[in-house]
């Protein structure tokens, strides 16, 4: 993965956009980031906050001005942080895969936050990289497809939240990213494709090919998609594709 140490991504204050879960608690807020980038995130200064990096583990927390009153790693690879500050401050998260994520914390009173920092993990992870580079290419694509669709991820692969993944669908079809799995050089995305017309449409795997695509697979053999029908389309992409 290409590192961008100068890029700064200000995700706004990821506070008001949080949705309320069924039990009345705040649902996790997903914040897309790049390695070396920065995001401005509202956190609670009256309750602990949980930060996680899906598919990775946070191994260090560095607060340059000592604004964090507590930070404690969790067994699952996240970190719980607390502060009583009322003014914005910055802290850095380091991960097992080598990511450095800068958080500009904006303290507010209220319930503790759960923040998922989603970064493109391609190019990181020695276990996945060793397996991908040692496996013949065609066999690699087949194995990834079978493993992910069978619910057993290859070594070093992880499921991560959907962020900006898109699929260019033919006329009459819509597509929505449903799930994402990532390794070292490759990632796999499942899209839900729907026929929005009033008649059946012919479809082929090649209809969904775009730059960075390495393989396209339908969830079941099909040459047509009926009016109003949906199907899953699995796409394997390299570092150049979203």
Curated annotation (Swiss-Prot):
Main location: membrane
Topological type in the membrane: Lipid-anchor
Entry-linked InterPro entries: TraK_C, TraK_Ftype, TraK_N
Record gene name: traK
Protein name per the record: TraK lipoprotein
CC annotations in GO: plasma membrane
Secretion signal span: 1-16
Function summary: Involved in pilus assembly.
Lineage of the organism: Bacteria, Pseudomonadati, Pseudomonadota, Gammaproteobacteria, Enterobacterales
Lipidation (S-diacylglycerol cysteine): 17
Pfam families in the cross-refs: TraK_C, TraK_N
Lipid sites, type N-palmitoyl cysteine: 17
Annotated compartments: Cell membrane
UniProt KW keywords: Cell membrane, Conjugation, Lipoprotein, Membrane, Palmitate, Plasmid, Signal
């Amino acid at each position: 993965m290409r590192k961008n140490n100068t890029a700064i991504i200000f995700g706004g204050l990821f506070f008001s956009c949080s949705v309320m879960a069924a039990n009345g608690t705040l649902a996790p807020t997903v914040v897309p980031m790049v390695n070396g980038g920065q995001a401005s995130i509202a956190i609670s200064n009256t309750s602990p906050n949980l930060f996680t990096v899906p598919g990775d583990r946070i191994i260090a927390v560095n607060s340059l001005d000592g604004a964090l009153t507590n930070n404690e790693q969790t067994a699952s690879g996240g970190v719980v942080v607390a502060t009583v500050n009322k003014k914005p401050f910055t802290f850095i998260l380091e991960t097992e895969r080598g990511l450095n994520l800068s958080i500009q914390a904006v303290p507010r009173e209220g319930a503790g936050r759960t923040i998922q920092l989603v970064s493109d993990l391609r190019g990181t992870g020695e276990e996945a990289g060793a397996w991908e580079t040692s496996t013949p290419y065609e066999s690699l694509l087949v194995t990834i497809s079978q493993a992910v669709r069978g619910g057993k991820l290859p070594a070093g692969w992880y499921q991560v939240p959907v962020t900006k993944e898109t699929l260019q669908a033919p006329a009459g079809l819509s597509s929505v990213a449903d799930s994402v799995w990532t390794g070292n050089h490759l990632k796999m995305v499942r899209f839900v494709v729907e026929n929005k017309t009033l008649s059946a449409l012919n479809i082929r795997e090649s209809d969904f090919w775009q730059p960075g695509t390495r393989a396209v697979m339908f969830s079941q053999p099909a040459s047509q998609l009926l009016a109003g029908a949906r199907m899953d389309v699995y796409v394997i992409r390299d570092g150049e594709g979203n």
